Amino acid sequence: MNRMRYGLILVWVMGWALGDLQRIKGEEPVSLSGIYPSLAMFNNENECGTGAVVPWNGDLWVITYGPHLPFGSSDKLYQISPTLQQTVRSESVGGTPANRMIHEESQQLFIGPYVIDQRSNVRVIPPTAMPGRLTGNARHLTDPANKVFFATMEEGLYEVDVHTLKVTSLIRDGNKLPTNFAPTTPLSQLESKLPGYHGKGLYSTQGRLIYANNGDRDPRVTTDPTTPSGALGEWFKAGDDWKLIRRNQFTEVTGPKGILGGNTNGPAWSIGWDAKSLILMVLEDGKWSSFRLPKVSHSYDGAHGWNTEWPRIRDIGEEDLLMTMHGAFWRFPKNFSAQNPTGIRPRSAYLKVIGDFCRWGDRLVLGCDDSAKSEFLNTRKVKGNIDSVGQSQSNLWFIEPSRLDQLGPTPASGAVWLHDKVQPGDKSDSFLVAGWKYRTAWIVDHEHKTTERKEIPGDVEWFQFTVERSSNDFSLIVTLANDETRNSEADETFDGVARVDDKANHGGIFRIRGENKRTLAFATDADYYELDGELKLRKVKDQGAEEWLRSKAPIPKDVIQLDAASILIVDDRGRRWRLPRANQAFDSFIAQGKQRICREVATERDMLNVGGTFFELPAENADGFAKLRPIASHSLQITDFGSYRGLLVLSGISADTTTNPHIIRSDDGKTGLWLGAIDDLWKLGKPVGEGGPWKEQAVSKNEVSDPYLMWGYSNRSIKLVHDQEKDIAFDIELDLMGTGDWIAYTSILVPSGKKETQLSFPPQLHARWLRVRAREACTATAWLSYR
């Protein structure tokens, strides 16, 4: 078979992925918000994430992974037909795989340890032949027609013959072999010295193999997200170890050839991050260049790298590629290079944890990491003693391509320098500012105690700064935002959920069951129910299961404080944070223990529901409340929230009847649940609220208030008043990124006699937290309105 025919076959195969496949109407299983509960995937491990999703031979092929399982697991290879019928392949051997590549010459799909030909025959490379957590594939450097590379998460490197599947070990995988494990492949004695671990991407081009990892074995990574971690490396030939390119956390490595694994001379891209911002590395003509992008979400931070899954840059059949990174969808031009660095743009923010994605027919398929049996390091007192889910599970999310631009807003921030030493003439990395209307640079010289604010012109795509004087402690921070386009009205998707002023509320608590039952246990005050994969909610007599649920998933009390000023949270490190109320009527539900405050809604992702607002709450190892962001405000009387088969579940249903398909009524008609996608929450409405750090509070001279959340709100103003018979100056200070670095914003002289002074904040001003300082002792009110 000649190369021309290979190319024709590839075009035919990709045609199935990009447009020829049409959904068969009337034969699809039940779905809500693009999630089919019948397609949920389960394992017996502490996590069940989606490692790869690839269209091949008309079907969709999917693999799942468990956490740190280099020698196999209960995870499966799935084959999904155009009618969305799921087949669990008997060849499954599990593990922690996330690799995928189409080998053009042999017309085989490599996905995890599986090799699938044009007739959907599956061959397996067992863990005994290739131990390790398989994270990436790439084209071979010297024999690409006959071999492919595999890399592992612990820096292992193999080459595999695509015909015989013979494995050659080039760099030994970093996992210690169990005593009862007998490898069938002679393992290399070369053990990598590349810093970091927790490998992610792999790609070959320009005579080298490029590899990324995003973790480190330093014990500080479990608590301090600023710990040095991760590496970007390259490899040239057998006998070599990985050569360090840059010591930061990196994830995806790819280029214009994408799933084909590399090319001869094209560019390569790698996306990563540090405590300051995102880092984009570009290889062009043998030279590496670096760029910086802002972070939309901080839930992906954490020096251990566990919170990221596998960020990707993939072809979805559009003019631009799609990049997922730090909670945002991004346009990524196919021709992006150091010489042509134009076109990267934020599209919208998302809440799902996405491991891989692809175009299949007329929709995008996002493979998610939805519900993990283990909370890993993601525990905190505000959640109470709730037990984690009974069985790990995840699902696929099908969306129209247009939805990539329709989810959440993308206010973002990042730093180029953060408490760094600089010299006159030092130039910053180029920092992306295109795609946002409001673009502000903050030049903070901590050593010389100066702060300068600059508005970045609208025609600038990449902002670059040149240092004018030396400093031993210098920061350059960029904040970015657009106008909020949502209103305050909830979408009809939430019709049937009880409102805060409803007298009757069919609420209750729930938890995913274990023991492979694959149901959701749900208990109201009086009865016990179970929800199954067909979305049937049935009353069940099971006293043991009911007692277990009530004892393991109670709604905790007294995990937050409510006072006249605002919502006060004291986190696990003793830090104090204040949040606005969207509706004070929720106070009574919280006080009575009728509303869950915090719960994990996706793997290692907590959501906070307090005062009528949902907030995204990063894990404590990603700095927790310091990086909090509001998602949406609402008037829903939600008792409990969580996940099941990839769906977001809400309890607290109105007694009124509704035809909303998102409301699943029980078979006895006494209760119900709301089901949808976690990213439906954006449709509840824009974040709003009122409150402040002080309300008629006695404060001493130069006392500073608790931090009060400012990020993610619009139409903001502050009102100041005090009780003294003289004018008093109040200082307003900002923490731009939630790093604890406070800068002076403005001072306001507030007149005597309890006369209010009000200040409206301009739309271009964005900061994570605000605090107030009184220059004299007084009883003061600092009251903020976010409308």
Residue spans for each PLM region:
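Beta-propeller blade signature
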Residues: D75-P82, E159, D224-D240, I279-D285, ...
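Beta-propeller domains
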Residues: W61-G94, G112-P126, D161, I171, ...
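Entry beta-strands of beta-propeller and related beta-repeat scaffolds
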Residues: D59-V62, S106-F110, P144-F149, S204-Y211, ...
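Repeated scaffold domains used in trafficking and secretory/extracellular systems
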Residues: E45-A52, S92-S106, A129-N146, G174-G207, ...
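A short helix->beta-strand "capping" segment at the edge of beta-propeller domains
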Residues: E27-N46, Y438-T440, V444-K454
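Noncatalytic modules at the cell exterior or secretory-pathway interfaces
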Residues: P762-C778
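Residue-level signature of beta-propeller blades and closely related beta-rich strand-turn architectures
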Residues: G66-H68, Y114-V115, M153-E155, N214-R217, ...
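Blade-level signature of beta-propeller repeat domains, shared across WD40, Kelch, NHL, RCC1
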Residues: D356-K421, T639-A698, L709
